[in-house]
């Protein structure tokens, strides 16, 4: 079984003072959010084959996060800031940038469909569009499997940070949380699903979707035209 490398794994390693992590490609799955957090913290993820020794000597051009980091440090009083403060400010800047981009970005992804209709989506290629049903909150949504694939079900990714919004489901939905935690408020109680958990929401439910932190999950809905029923 492959090991799932999540954003929390990166944060924990960084908190321990580590600056890099080596993973074996064939035995690991690195989530997109883990890569984003690693870039944010200046943390290096080295991907290697089992037969190749881990190396952290790769030198690359300055990434966007490094440029943001340098700009932030340049505006802070010399010697009067901590790495934790810099990380918090970087996260704020990148989230604001992501929110602006999300407002104009069209959802997209790379996939391959076989002759018999079997479809494989490259999870790392997924770019989010904005879910209109959650305005004014910036909620990302990308449909990956739709009626156009000849499917009676739909599937896709959703993600957002620190927001709650009402929604009524005229369809059945199953959600598998990939990152963070998903809160669903319904009939006076709050159900919480964390990374690795699966949640079922029956048709006809009037709920409040949300998270006090951040969440990214895979949804499967029936029927496939869930947005128009």
From Swiss-Prot:
- For this protein, what does the record note about how its cofactor is bound? Does not need divalent cations.
**Expression triggers:** Part of the 17-gene eut operon transcribed from a single promoter, induced by ethanolamine and adenosylcobalamin (AdoCbl, vitamin B12).
Can you tell which superkingdom this protein's organism belongs to? Bacteria
Pfam family, any one:
EutQ
Q: How is it used?
A: Artificial BMCs can be made in E.coli by expressing eutK, eutL, eutM, eutN, eutS (eutSMNLK). Cargo proteins can be targeted to them. The addition of eutQ to the eutSMNLK construct results in biogenesis of multiple BMCs. This can lead to the development of tailored BMCs for specific metabolic reactions.
Provide the GO MF annotations for this entry.
Answer: acetate kinase activity; ATP binding
Which EC class, in a word?
A: transferase
Annotated spans, Required for interaction with EutM: 1-100
Q: Which reaction does it catalyse?
A: acetate + ATP = acetyl phosphate + ADP
The subcellular localization recorded is: Bacterial microcompartment
The effect of residue 172 to A is: Complements deletion as well as wild-type
User: Which UniProt keywords are present, listed alphabetically?
Assistant: ATP-binding, Bacterial microcompartment, Kinase, Nucleotide-binding, Transferase, Virulence
| Record-level GO BP terms | ethanolamine catabolic process; generation of precursor metabolites and energy
Q: Report the GO terms under cellular component.
A: ethanolamine degradation polyhedral organelle
- What Enzyme Commission number does this protein have? 2.7.2.1
Query: What quaternary structure, including any partners, is listed in this protein's UniProt entry?
Result: Homodimer. Interacts with the N-terminus of EutM; a probably cytoplasm-facing helix (EutM 'Val-49' to 'Gln-64') interacts with N-terminus of EutQ.
Family (UniProt): Belongs to the EutQ cupin-like family.
- Give the function comment from the record: A bidirectional acetate kinase that may drive flux through the ethanolamine (EA) degradation pathway under anoxic conditions found when this bacteria infects the host intestine. It may generate ATP that can be used by other enzymes (EutA and EutT) in the eut pathway. Can use GTP instead of ATP with reduced efficiency. Might be required to correctly target EutE to bacterial microcompartments (BMC). Required for the biogenesis of multiple mobile BMCs per cell. Might serve as an assembly hub for BMC shell proteins.
Protein name as annotated? Acetate kinase EutQ
Q: What gene is this protein a product of?
A: eutQ
């Amino acid at each position: 079984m492959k090991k799932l490398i999540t954003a929390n794994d990166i944060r924990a390693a960084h908190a321990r003072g580590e600056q890099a992590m080596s993973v074996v490609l064939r035995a690991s799955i690195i989530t997109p959010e883990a890569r984003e957090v690693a870039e944010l913290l200046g943390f290096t993820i080295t991907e290697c084959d089992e037969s190749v020794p881990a190396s952290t000597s790769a030198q690359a051009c300055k990434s966007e996060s490094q440029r943001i980091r340098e700009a932030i440090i340049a505006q802070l009083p010399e010697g009067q800031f901590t790495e934790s403060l810099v990380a918090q400010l970087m996260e704020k800047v990148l989230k604001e940038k992501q929110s602006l981009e999300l407002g104009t970005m069209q959802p997209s992804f790379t996939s391959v469909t076989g002759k018999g209709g079997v479809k494989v989506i490259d999870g790392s290629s997924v770019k989010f569009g904005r879910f209109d049903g959650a305005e004014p909150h910036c909620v990302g949504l990308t449909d990956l499997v739709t009626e156009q694939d000849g499917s009676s079900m739909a599937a896709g990714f959703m993600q957002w940070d620190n927001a709650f919004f009402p929604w009524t489901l005229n369809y059945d939905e199953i959600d598998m949380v990939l990152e963070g935690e998903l809160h669903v408020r319904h009939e006076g109680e709050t159900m919480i699903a964390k990374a690795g958990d699966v949640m079922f929401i029956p048709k006809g439910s009037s709920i409040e979707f949300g998270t006090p932190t951040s969440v990214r999950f895979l949804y499967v809905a029936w029927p496939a035209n869930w947005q128009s029923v």
